[in-house]
A protein has these predicted regions:
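A charged, solvent-exposed segment within the mature domains of Sec-exported extracytoplasmic proteins
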Residues: 132-187
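Hydrophobic loop/turn residues within beta-sheet-rich immunoglobulin-like superfamily modules
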Residues: 62, 80, 117, 136, ...
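Short, surface-exposed interaction patches in beta-rich subdomains
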Residues: 162-163, 172-284
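Acidic/polar low-complexity surface segments
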Residues: 8, 14, 99-102, 258-264
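Short linear S-[DN]-x-LW-Φ motif typified by the pepsin-like aspartic protease active-site region
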Residues: 26-91, 105-125, 130-144, 151-154, ...
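An anionic, turn-rich surface loop/hairpin at beta-sheet edges
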Residues: 94-106
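Hydrophobic membrane-insertion alpha-helices, especially the h-region
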Residues: 6-23
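Positively charged n-region of N-terminal signal peptides that target proteins for export
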Residues: 1-4
Length: 284
């Protein structure tokens, strides 16, 4: 009985090893490096539509419209009526969650270069990894990170006339931007901004995450709400024309900035309206 058990165990181990070697070999062939580079005339493109699976997506300023990709996915790039559609396609699915293949070492990287011109539309969605958008000038932008995966989104030195952002588990950071008419909503991730001007906008976090606004432009005016997190804001210089409407339900509001007298500076044309349920509101 013991010999039979040992023989069966040996057969099982040998079969498992052979199957693993064959599987990894197949996956290695299936996960070869794919590179692509395409350029487009600057006067032919007025909009961008980017759909990524799990690449590090980088949008940056340059002399000419171009798309560069390195990774394991297939990339589909098409110009349709002045809009450049960039889609990272899934090659195969891992239905069993066996994501331990040692050959999967390539890090996908998608770079989109945009010349110094104002776009009409910018659409971006991704499932995981990181997104960095730099020096983008656009009339309307829609950034959708509504998937379960985490995508760290950065919008830097950009000018957006109208912004729509949705991030389920994806934090967004605005750095040195000029943003107007924004609708920014995060279900389970922070909203951060630094040295930015935000006007006529709404910032909303629906769970216990915070809204951090550091060294903001003194002409910022918007509404912000965090269900159970805190809202913390500071200015880049002494405010001159601001009215605070701070509404914490169970939390506290604290104004440490000495420029304010009864939550007001000057005429109060730039209104900051903030709400929390259990979190605190702090103006530094």
């Amino acid at each position: 009985m013991k010999k039979l058990f040992i023989s069966g165990l040996i057969i099982f181990v040998v079969c498992f090893v052979l199957a693993s070697v064959m599987w990894f070999g197949f996956e290695r062939q299936n996960n070869k490096l794919n590179t692509a580079h395409k350029s487009f005339p600057n006067d032919k493109i007025n909009g961008l539509h980017i759909s990524s699976q799990n690449s590090f997506v980088e949008v940056k300023r340059g002399k000419q419209f171009s798309v560069s990709y390195k990774g394991q996915k297939k990339l589909n790039v098409q110009n349709h009526n002045g809009t450049l559609y960039i889609k990272e396609q899934r090659n195969s699915e891992d239905h069993y969650g066996l994501n331990f293949n040692p050959f999967r070492k390539i890090k996908e990287h998608l770079v989109v270069t945009v010349p110094d011109k104002k776009l009409k539309q910018f659409d971006l969605k991704s499932k995981r990894n990181r997104v960095e958008v730099n020096q983008l000038d656009v009339e309307k932008a829609k950034i959708n990170m509504a998937y379960e995966g985490i995508v760290k989104v950065g919008l830097n030195r950009s000018n957006v006339d109208k912004l729509f952002y949705r991030g389920k588990n994806s934090p967004v950071t605005l750095t040195k931007d000029k943003i107007a008419n924004a609708n920014i909503k995060s279900s389970n991730a922070h909203i951060n901004a630094e040295e930015s001007l935000i006007e006529k906008s709404v910032l909303l976090v629906t769970r216990d995450k915070d809204i951090h606004l550091d060294k903001m432009d003194i002409n910022s005016n918007f509404k912000a709400s965090s269900e159970n997190g805190d809202i913390i804001m500071s200015y880049n210089r002494k405010p001159e024309n601001v009215l605070l409407k701070l509404n914490p339900s169970d939390g506290k509001s604290k104004v440490f900035n000495s420029s304010f007298n009864d939550d007001k500076v000057g005429k109060g044309d730039n209104v900051l309206e903030m709400y929390t349920e259990k979190g605190n509101i702090q103006i530094n």
